[in-house]
């Protein structure tokens, strides 16, 4: 049984899903970028409680590759701060390297119920 404090933390938890779509001709460069730059950026994020960096498998993707970064924050305010500051920095770095070719989709997730 989860403690009351832990349950409150899960209710306040705020999640952000970032999906990066890379065209087929840039997959090798993107994979290298993930290993050399993106992983380091994510490791150094101050307000991110936990994260999962994943390759997305889907029958819907026929060209290119999708990568997802799922970020967990303590609360909505920390997520908003991330979007206003860190997300802009990450986006600018990716655009400097790949231009408009790598598309970034952000999705805010607000847990209603969970079972961790």
Locations of the language-model features?
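Short, surface-exposed loop and linker segments with low hydrophobicity and enrichment for Pro/Ser/Thr
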Residues: 6-13, 42-45
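Short amphipathic alpha-helical segments
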Residues: 26-53, 89-92
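Glycine-rich beta-strand-turn "strand-cap" elements at beta-sheet edges
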Residues: 6, 10, 50-65, 92-116
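Short, well-ordered beta-strand segments in beta-rich or mixed alpha/beta enzyme
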Residues: 14-21, 54-86
């Amino acid at each position: 049984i989860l403690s009351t404090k832990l349950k409150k933390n899960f209710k306040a938890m705020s999640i952000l899903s970032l999906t990066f779509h890379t065209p087929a001709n840039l997959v090798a460069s993107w994979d290298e970028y993930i290993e050399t730059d993106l992983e380091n950026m994510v490791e150094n994020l101050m307000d991110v409680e936990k994260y999962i960096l994943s390759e997305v498998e889907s029958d819907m993707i026929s060209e290119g590759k999708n990568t997802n970064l799922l970020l967990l924050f303590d609360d909505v305010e920390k997520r908003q701060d991330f979007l206003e500051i860190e997300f802009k920095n990450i986006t600018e770095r990716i655009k400097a390297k790949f231009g408009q070719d790598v598309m970034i989709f952000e999705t805010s997730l607000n847990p209603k119920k969970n079972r961790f």
